[in-house]
Amino acid sequence: MAISTLTLTQSLYTRSFRPTIFFSSSSSSSFSCLCSSSSDCEPKLSVKKRVFGVGLGFLASSILSLTPLDADATRIDYYATVGDPLCEYSYAKSGLGFCDLDVGFGDEAPRGVLVNIHYTARFADGTLFDSSYKRARPLTMRIGVGKVIRGLDQGILGGEGVPPMRVGGKRKLQIPPKLAYGPEPAGCFSGDCNIPGNATLLYDINFVEIYPGSNTR
């Protein structure tokens, strides 16, 4: 996976990295050699070695110059496509399934405040259909006032046997159709709909923060 490149050390690049360089045979400056004997190819091979050395130098410098921002971008791409670990759901009377991976360390969100969350959203078969990580910023939403689907409100704010989330918490939600978009398709544009009717939705929620300066209303 792309994430694994973040753990490589400089020694690995210099000792075990073996790049493959391809030379086009269609170019007039091609290094392809069609000859009847090895001696006819020696001058071209020496040129190839010099070019290979220069190319390897550029390649090594570009790899070793991986910045923290590059690493963050790779992590964002990783979390946009890979879900949190599996856990066993508990179920509220409403039918909402919930499971805490991390209870969190901060405050609970009062009804009506703005909160920032990161999330990935999947269908019941595991197919990803939305993720805040792909946009590289959390979603800002007003909690508990009907601005989002009922399953998200209840899953974050709590109620009916669901404990409220705390800042820093990570929770998995299994949202039945009646707490999501119901029997009608959703996310439709020009006749194409992202979410079919009667879809059960799976959310991985990361409660980032209560929006600074947010007030209930």
Curated annotation (Swiss-Prot):
One of its GO terms (molecular function) is peptidyl-prolyl cis-trans isomerase activity. This is Photosynthetic NDH subunit of lumenal location 4, chloroplastic. Pfam families: FKBP_C. Keywords: Chloroplast, Disulfide bond, Isomerase, Plastid, Rotamase, Thylakoid, Transit peptide, Transport. The gene is PNSL4. One of its GO terms (cellular component) is chloroplast. Belongs to the FKBP-type PPIase family. It comes from Arabidopsis thaliana (Mouse-ear cress). Its EC number is 5.2.1.8.
